[in-house]
Amino acid sequence: MRISIFLLTVFFFSCKEKNQTVALYPLESPKERIEWEIQRLADPVTGNIPNNIRQKELLFAKNLPKSKSFNKSNWLHRGPYNVGGRTRALCLDVLDENTILAGGASGGMFRSTDGGQSWTMTTEPSQEHRISCLTQDRRPGKENVWYFGTGENRGSYVINVSMYGNGIWKSIDGGLSWDSLPITTTNTPTNLDGDFDFMFSLKTDPSNDSLDVVYAATRGDIYRTEDGGNSWSKQLGGPNSNYYQYTDVEVTSNGVVYATISSNCVDNGIWRSSDGQTWKNILPTNFPPGYSRVEIGVSPSNENVVYFIAAETTGYGQYTQTFFNGSTWTSLWKYEYLSGDGTGAGGRWTDLSANIPANYPASFDNFNAQGSYDLLVSVHPTDTNLVIIGGTNLWRSTDGFTTPNNTSIIGGYLAGSKEGHGNWGSYENHHPDQHEILYLPSDDNVMINGNDGGVYKTLNVFKDTVDWISLNNGYNTTQLYVATISKNANSDVMHAGLQDNGNRVTFSSNSNSTWKMPFNGDGMIAGIADNEEDFYLSIQRGVLYKMKLDNTGAATAFQRMDPASCDSTNYRWKNPMTMDSNNDNVLYWSEKNKIWRHNSLNTIPYNNSNNKSNFGWDFFSDSLHVQMDITTLNSSVNPPDILYFGTSSKYMYRIDNASIGDPPKTILTGPPTGSNSFTADIAINPLDADEIICVYSNYSVYSLFHSTDGGQSWEKIAGNLEETPTGSGNGPSCRTALIIPFDNDTLYLVGTTVGLFGTRDLDGPNTIWTQIGFEEFGSTIVEDLSFRQSDNLLVVATYGNGVYQINIPNSNVLLSNNEISLDDMQFNVFPNPTTEVINFSLKTNKDYRWVIYNQLGSIVNQSPTKKGVGNTNEKINISNLKPGLYFISVIIDGKSITNEFIIK
């Protein structure tokens, strides 16, 4: 039941909420988070995360069997209702400003029709969820047409875990449903081989009445379409070998296009075009020679005025000291079009870089784009002096940044924040890391902002101290590390540890209830006492608190409790911890190669202290070698008092009588997997502690092992979750497991980077795992699983769509086989390979329909329901599809059978 994430985000924060006791803790170095990610994901042989593994594993998962025992109504999406995730894509509908579309970086597309008071997810679970940009056709009569782009090059330190997308998607019904534009999808996700794998910006041309013109800022290139995305022509860019290739594009109301391309690319510079086809590089001669991402801000009330903010202009522009001893250079320029093609004397440039916020005594107050991760510039619709630039914070200038004197922080981190425990927080009811700004057409005092915490609104952007309202009301795009439930039967108490959004707690089963945040930072592993008042909450790098919460989840008292004798530099990013499964007074804690135990949690006093304490702690003297790291802990139910723990070097151990004295450890027989494999979880049968499953999370290693004798012997059970018998290939990263015994059988569950899988029948290396919840959370990453046997409550924590729960009285209803057997029905596809048509023959007298998918699971063609006539033959025209591998499924009575075919 221990967890990990897949998609790397390098930046994190801590929040402060109104009317709550909140301990404030600072960010940690991105380097530490990255090292943790690499260790648990990388191929132990090469030390690298396999190239483009996210796309490869999604393709691999397409062929795995799927269970449809439960429909959506059986699953309860618990939330967190009031918390959002990273949001780069955000637009207001020009037909109705109360209709907002927002896309999560890993959570899919959402739509609100009431100004953000509620949201509906409009992408299907099987569709693309990595949304990076969004635009609407604003022309009269065309307003129902929308486009979103996918894939996020986040400026991370680890290339292979950036969020690859797969092209552009289009809606013709106002954003209610979406289909991919086939020409922008590669259908070959084994390589970064498409310009549309990363998308930075999409813009339509509102001035062209005869053509459906859209511009796309992709990885190193600017593209243009005249037919709504059916075909594209490259306007700028070329063959680019660099990974980080940033672009941006903006279009004025009269069709003038501005585009930027980073300095390491072909056609680098700042470009202007009056027709979208003839381009002039207007970059001033004294512009910094080196720059990464350059964002564009057109002044709505005077579109001849354009601002450009450039990140990583090393040696030029404004130098700022950033938090944790970092530094960066940033440049801000204002351009005024005067005449002609805008070059030379046809445009006036003003360097405003010296007025970028810098040299503040509190390092969090200085401008920081975090290596191009968060960057924006925006001009108010009517007041040209109100200009906002965004990085970690929102900085507002009321004189257009012509001086440094009229600038203030209006969002992000709390002004005056600096390094050190208790010295920083977030701006009230807001979140750091800014990505998008919109203004309400009917009232341009109202501004809407998308950032790493979701969507927020202010009613008065001009106010000295800007007040924010969260619009994360069911905008379920949160990214979880862990979910923890009370041990009490039928209890609604639940904890969620969220990336960037702290430790959240709810006492209500209502999916629309507010989840309070008693402890900020990156929420990690937790324990809940049986009284449901005392909570043991941790954040990144091993900071642990005991907190007393009221029945709303608000903290009324606290005490830091991680051992004072521990060396904090030994803690992991997600430091292992587990509460004893039978005794809520006992907690186990790790410090690198050591295990600590607290046997009297209820005696820890609440002194509201932020100081570490040795009170009540003992450590086991039988520690591991100093170079070994403990990565997961789990305790038994029956028999009690057995502690299993795993390491980053594949080895696992067992301690009997773990809660008494100073017991020795026993090394378990090592499963036959590669050395330095990361032990992500050890699942224990609650009725028989000798039955365990070991989960290794690295790619290119065998992932799942099963033992019925307490780890003396092991059997491989990953089965069809591996592409090869050795674990190499494109199988997913396994993260967590559960063993759930019922009266007549046992259910085995595994959370992976491509969803949740289960089986009743372990058959060694031939085990068949079936995907569960495909229609609910699809192939979203499952980080953590929890189960309460007293009422059969299963909780699923996802990275991108929050927390789901379901009561499962037995395994049959959760895991029935809905695949049609080939023995029961004849289904042939021919010719294969093919070019323009595909034929299939079907022997059935029942109603049926067919669906064609590309490799990523996107529907590219489908039929209405038809009547089978015994021997049925169909011919389908597929001439509009690109060459590649496809799948055709025939659905009868809710069951399906699938064949693959290739288009040459």
Regions found by a protein language model. Give the residues of each.
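C-terminal motif of bacterial Sec signal peptides marking the signal peptidase cleavage site
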Residues: F13-S14
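C-terminal outer-membrane/trafficking sorting elements
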Residues: F6, I820-F830, T834-K904
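Short, well-ordered helical secondary-structure segments
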Residues: R2, F364-N366, W424-S426, I485, ...
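Low-complexity, Pro/Thr/Ser/Gly/Ala-rich linker/spacer regions in secreted
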Residues: I808-D824
